[in-house]
Amino acid sequence: MAMIGMNIIGLFMVLMLLLISLIILFACKPWRYFSRFRSSSRFSSTFKVGDLQRPLISDDGNLIQGQTSEVTREYDLEGACYQNDGLLHSSLTEGRFYKQRLPSSSPHFSQGESFVLEVISEPSDNALVGQTLKLPAEKGSLAEVQTYDWQNNRNENLQYNLEKDRLINLSPRLVEDQRSWLFLEVIAGPAIGLQHAVNSTSSSKLPVKLGRVSPSDLALKDSEVSGKHAQITWNSTKFKWELVDMGSLNGTLVNSHSISHPDLGSRKWGNPVELASDDIITLGTTTKVYVRISSQNEFQIPFKIGVASDPMAMRRGGRKLPMEDVCHYKWPLPGANKFGLFCVCDGHGGSGAAQSAIKIIPEVLANILSDSLRKEKVLSKRDASDVLRDMFAKTEARLEEHQYEGCTATVLLVWKDNEENFFAQCANLGDSACVIHLGGRYIQMTEDHRVVSLSERKRFQEAGLALRDGETRLFGINLARMLGDKFPKQQDSRFSAEPYISEPLRIDQSSKDVFAVLASDGLWDVVSPKKAVQLVLQMRDKERGRESSAEKIANGLLNEARAMRTKDNTSIIYLDFDTSL
């Protein structure tokens, strides 16, 4: 009985030891070491010797330095603008963020230095232990983990070139120079000679509005032009100027092709059309506008200019007056970049002679000043009398076809010396006049050539051909000096094309309140030079510091002539030498 009890106790002790051993075995899990050994053996079979010798990051500091200096040399351009937006955001949307630090000046890397930090939100299923992750080159990535054979440098040049090309592709792009100058000139119609220039970056002056009523940048006094006819905008996406018809009644053409809405007269806008240099815009049937486009500011005028004109129709008992005035200005003249021309012509017997003269005068003057000797003579002597006299003679010689048509001509020549001071000299035929305000007083730059004027009566008397009592016209013409009128000039020697030429005026840079007013007799018949100057001074004070004040002043003088009930065509050029306003 005792033996049976001892056997039971022994068996119980063995079971307890076995249970304790099992508990220890399960707690320690020794089988996991066998699993790791098998896995490690399998992984190690996929390694190559070259992979064990290849580091995760190149330890050649010169490589990274060379790449950085190359990018700087390619893209550090003076005056260049860069687009930086969007380079980082594209990486974030792909679930990857890359951060790159510039390498130190030392070719060796110190401990703790950070080169590339990579965070990957999408783990690779095929990645093996110790293997370098190769990420595909993606647009917008700022850095990439590299593999580099440091043992024999066999791939150094290839890797360098590939990385350089990749960095160049990923670097910020140079933004194209968006500056573009638009120049418009009316070459046909009642407002012939009117000009306007604008820069694509002058957002406050855009769009350019073409129409008959204010506020139009190109104010066209043509009954066929709608109040708001068309406008020109700068398309910053295409880098192009675009013209759109604003629902005009008589339509808009570009190079004889309509750009208006198909339902003409519906007041619906047309589609935008790209403009190119040398295009011709036709508004209605008579007004034509020449287009020039340049990437450089070749149209900049060193003073402010305002132009205004009105045929003053319905002033004579309800009879419509044809527009025979033409005005024109050009700065600089071709081949004479320090010279500019301002001209008003008033036709009689028709507008043909005036329109011919306004085209011939700038051409002849530019040809004369293209002679370097004559140009230098003007600059050195500060006097252009010979040039102006020659210009009128050559213009008159080219008007042979105008036997019964003539026109006045008032030409203001402005030039700049090497010290940036201006000079102004005027020549005229007829009764269109020019006045300049300088030094607190106004200066008459022209002479009145009407038959009844004192200067002409004196000239007749000196030639022994005095006027008879009560005689105020010759061959029905109230002018004694003009361009054209070839037949009357052949019949009466008192007619002349010899211009009056003023003394040159010097306008220093420091001069203030300097301006000129050129106008046809529609203004001067009802507004004296003194009153015109007073009106300008008042308007200058009111408009001081505002944009387009020159245009407003020109229109202000025109409104004064209208209020004074002028009965003749009126054209005005206002020239302000004080650009600080």
Curated annotation (Swiss-Prot):
EC id: 3.1.3.16
Residue ranges annotated as Extracellular topological domain: 1-7
Residue numbers binding Mn(2+) 1: 346-347
Tissue: Expressed in all tissues examined.
Subcellular location: Cell membrane
Knockout mutant characteristics: No visible phenotype under normal growth conditions, but mutant seedlings show increased sensitivity of roots to salt stress.
Signal sequence segment: none
PPM-type phosphatase domain segment(s): 304-577
Segments in the Cytoplasmic topological domain: 29-581
Residues the record lists as binding Mn(2+) 2: 346, 521, 568
Keywords: Cell membrane, Hydrolase, Magnesium, Manganese, Membrane, Metal-binding, Protein phosphatase, Signal-anchor, Transmembrane, Transmembrane helix
Keyword Phosphoprotein annotated: no
Transmembrane segments: 8-28
Catalytic reaction list: O-phospho-L-seryl-[protein] + H2O = L-seryl-[protein] + phosphate; O-phospho-L-threonyl-[protein] + H2O = L-threonyl-[protein] + phosphate
Membrane-topology annotation of the record: Single-pass type I membrane protein
Cofactor(s) of this protein: Mg(2+); Mn(2+)
Domain of life (superkingdom): Eukaryota
Cofactor remark: Binds 2 magnesium or manganese ions per subunit.
Keyword match Membrane: yes
InterPro entries for this protein: FHA_dom (IPR000253), Kinase_assoc_Pase (IPR016660), PP2C (IPR015655), PP2C_BS (IPR000222), PPM-type-like_dom_sf (IPR036457), PPM-type_phosphatase-like_dom (IPR001932), SMAD_FHA_dom_sf (IPR008984)
Top-level enzyme category: hydrolase
UniProt function note: Dephosphorylates the Ser/Thr receptor-like kinase RLK5. May function as a signaling component in a pathway involving RLK5. Binds and dephosphorylates CLAVATA1 (CLV1). Functions as a negative regulator of the CLV1 signaling in plant development. Dephosphorylates SERK1 receptor kinase on threonine residues in the A-loop. Dephosphorylation of SERK1 controls SERK1 internalization. Component of a signaling pathway which mediates adaptation to NaCl stress. Is not a component of the SALT OVERLY SENSITIVE (SOS) pathway.
Subunit structure: Association of RLK5 with kapp domain is dependent on phosphorylation of RLK5 and can be abolished by dephosphorylation. Interacts with SERK1 and CDC48A. Component of the SERK1 signaling complex, composed of KAPP, CDC48A, GRF6 or GRF7, SERK1, SERK2, SERK3/BAK1 and BRI1. Interacts with CLV1.
Protein name per its UniProtKB record: Protein phosphatase 2C 70
Organism: Arabidopsis thaliana
Name of the encoding gene: KAPP
